[in-house]
A protein has these predicted regions:
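Amphipathic, oligomerization/interface secondary-structure segments
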Residues: 22, 27-34, 39, 81-95, ...
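Long, compositionally biased intrinsically disordered regions
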Residues: 59-66, 70-72, 76-89, 97-162
């Protein structure tokens, strides 16, 4: 069971390794670990009331009709709103069932595209205390997230720009 939080930056040049850029997406993902581990069958996502609507929004230039892409191992496309709403209920029941199971591996994926550079981060960390303070703060933030994830038996994966 994987919780994915994605934020795409808009820098025109290669991104650096700012703690702020990473915190924007990662903080949200870590805050939502509860969605992966709770035994509360009735706990719904904060965006529950919009899961049956198009994504990202009705006014977006590129829009996907379905937020649910796969259901029970098959590609999903609803012929009408009633079917779409029923699919959201079915999908959420699967999530609720799996998150209660200790046999199901849980992961949080933090995707910080075009806003955080792994190369810049590594260069700054190799400078030790002379590295960028923002990068050193990002390191501390990542360590905190790893600790939180580990204490909840959740794997953490972070995807960033090169």
């Amino acid at each position: 069971l994987i919780y994915v939080d994605v934020k795409c930056g808009s820098v025109k040049v290669k991104p650096h390794s700012s703690a702020g850029a990473l915190a924007e997406v990662g903080g949200q993902a870590i805050k939502n670990i509860e969605m992966l581990i709770t035994r509360n069958k009735n706990l719904k996502a904060a965006n529950w009331n919009i899961l049956a609507s198009s994504w990202p929004t009705r006014n977006a230039p590129q829009q996907m009709t379905e937020r649910i892409r796969l259901l029970r191992g098959a590609r999903f496309s609803a012929p009408n709103q009633e079917t779409r709403e029923r699919a959201v209920e079915q999908a959420w029941e699967i999530v609720a069932q799996r998150r209660r199971s200790s046999r199901v591996q849980k992961e949080v994926w933090i995707v910080s595209a075009n806003s955080f550079s792994a190369t810049h981060f590594e260069i700054q960390l190799n400078k030790g205390h002379n590295g960028s303070q923002e990068s050193l703060q990002a390191y501390q933030l990542i360590q905190s997230w790893i600790s939180t994830a580990n204490s909840n038996d959740v794997d953490l994966k972070i995807f960033v720009s090169v």
